Each structure stands twice: as C-alpha cells, then as structure tokens.
C-alpha cells in the first residue's frame, strides 16, 4: 500500500464531496436536503479565494482520506491577535484504511497550511471517533463555545 498525499484540486471535487456526504452520514446527520450543490458552490468559491484548503490521500486512483481547513477572520483578541482562525472539517478516512496514520498525516498538512495563512487558532467540532486524534495533536476542549441555530 503506497499512499499518496496531494492538495485537492477541482478535478477531484466531486469525489471529495461524495466523501464529505459519506462522513456526515456516518456521523449520524439527518439528510433533509441535497447538500451537493451547496457544497460544490462553497468549495469552488473558497478554493478560488484561497480561504479553503484540503489535502487528500490516494491509494492508486482511489481517494481514501480527506481533510479540509476553512480560513475565517474576526476581530483580533488576546488569545488570537491576528484574528485569523482555521475551521477544520472534512476529516475522513475510509474504514478499511483507518488506524494507519492517514488522518494524522492529513491533519498535520492542513495545520501547516493554517500556520502559513497566519491563523492563531484552529477550531473543530469533533466526532466521537476523532476526539483521540485531535487530543493527541494538542487540541483541547473549549467550554465557552455556544451556538445559536437560525
């Protein structure tokens, strides 16, 4: 098994979106709408603007792992003087390839991208399965996070 890691390009976008939908289903999300058009629009726009980056893992021509980092900016604060934040998403590894270090490698690559972008912090809403990976990397729970659904 020779795994290749590369940046996501528009050529792989449809396959990447399929993996994202599979990830959401696996995490128990309810499918109430067709997300494909919205995801495609989001990724195309933000990849073009440089505010979304992704590394993918391939076994031959088969995409077996994904990662994603969206970059956002908010007013600077003491904990993040740049105001730049990374929002980690789309971390997915095909079940047959789990526990082989693939997610760890993908995560390290998007974290490097966040550093290069100037992010002072990275946030993620972690699945149960991913908590150990993120904790091992140094992510900590933030008790202050709240959300208001519109």
PLM regions and their residue ranges:
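A short helix-loop-beta-strand connector motif used in the catalytic cores of GNAT acetyltransferases and
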Residues: 44-56, 87
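A short beta-loop-alpha structural element at the N-terminal edge
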Residues: 4-18
């Amino acid at each position: 098994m020779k795994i290749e890691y590369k940046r996501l390009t528009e050529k792989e976008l449809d396959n990447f979106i399929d993996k994202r939908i599979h990830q959401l289903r696996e995490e128990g999300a309810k499918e109430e709408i067709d997300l494909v058009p919205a995801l495609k629009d989001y990724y195309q726009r933000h990849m073009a603007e440089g505010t979304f980056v992704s590394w993918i893992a391939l076994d031959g021509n088969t995409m077996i792992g994904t990662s994603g980092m969206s970059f956002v900016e908010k007013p600077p604060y003491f904990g993040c003087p740049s105001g730049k934040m990374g929002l980690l998403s789309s971390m997915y590894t095909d079940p047959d390839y789990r526990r082989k270090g693939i997610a760890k490698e993908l995560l390290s690559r998007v974290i490097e991208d966040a550093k290069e972008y100037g992010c002072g912090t990275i946030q993620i809403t972690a699945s149960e399965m991913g908590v150990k990976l993120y904790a091992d990397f140094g992510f900590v729970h933030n008790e202050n996070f709240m959300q208001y659904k519109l």
